[in-house]
Amino acid sequence: MGIKKKRQSKRLTTRKREGMLKRARANERKKRRMDRKMQAKVERIPPSVLRTDEENMQYAEIKRMAKLRKMEYDEALRNSEKKEAYLDGILRLVSKSDVVIEVIDARDPDSSRNSEAEKIVSEHGKKLIMVLNYTQYVPREVVDEWKVHLKRDGNDCIEVTEEDMRQIGKETRIGIFGNPGSGKNFVLRGISRILEEKPNSVVVSVPLSKVTLSSILRGCHGLMGIAFRDYIEAIVKRIDRGEVSLRHGIPEFSNAEELLESICDVHGIRDESRSVCYMKASERFLEDFLRHKILFWRRVYSDENDLSFAFCQ
């Protein structure tokens, strides 16, 4: 009787089984990649084609406002980080000064003041003198109104004149603070000229508390990251639109959008984004305010956007 041959097992070895699973996974990945490539090649209708023009404009405005909100948040975050640094500078200024001068823009004194810095000066018992700068661009009666208003808290309020500056003695240590562009160094040079020598002084720049129409017209804030069209609209509502049309050589307009469109056409401002075009047109429009070709000022107790305007020849 012969020996019965043993049947070969159908079980796979571990090595073969793992190899088959590995090849299966690789084939599955390859299939998914091919499916994605084929899907990408399929022509799809963009969502913008399915929307009406009005819906597209609304969608673009939503995106623009979301971008502005993010930029405003980033700016607020940066300002909060800078706040402690400038307050430290004010503390050093107060400690080294006998008299503290706050340089204020006469065109809008309220928005150019810094209440936190003023409070530090008061708490340290130092004398605060408010100096109104740019008074030559404001009607005399408006300057006088502001001087009376600012003196109500017991502080001195003067102008950059020889008679007013004489009260600052040569031996006095002076601390000067104010917003960017307020004219701090101009005031210091005026004091040096009147006293016939440069006084012992410390100068600190303090940020504005918020964005206002006058701070934009004074060049303290750029247009990037703010709702600049709202401020242009506020100007259009209050200014002589006929005079603006003559100065820029543009047709008559009734609102900010028509003004900016006309400036874009006249100066050949073109860009893929309408918002960028309008920002460039706004910067061109604001040049006359920065160069003092269009004067502006705010009266006591007026709203922060309620400015008066006058045109220079």
From Swiss-Prot:
GTP binds at residues 95-98, 178-185, 212-215. Its main location: nucleus. It is found in: Nucleus, Nucleolus. CDD domains: YlqF_related_GTPase. GO terms for molecular function: GTP binding. Residues 15-27 have a biased composition (Basic and acidic residues). It comes from the Eukaryota. Keywords: GTP-binding, Nucleotide-binding, Nucleus, Ribosome biogenesis. Residues 1-14 have a biased composition (Basic residues). This is Guanine nucleotide-binding protein-like 3-like protein. It comes from Encephalitozoon cuniculi (strain GB-M1) (Microsporidian parasite).
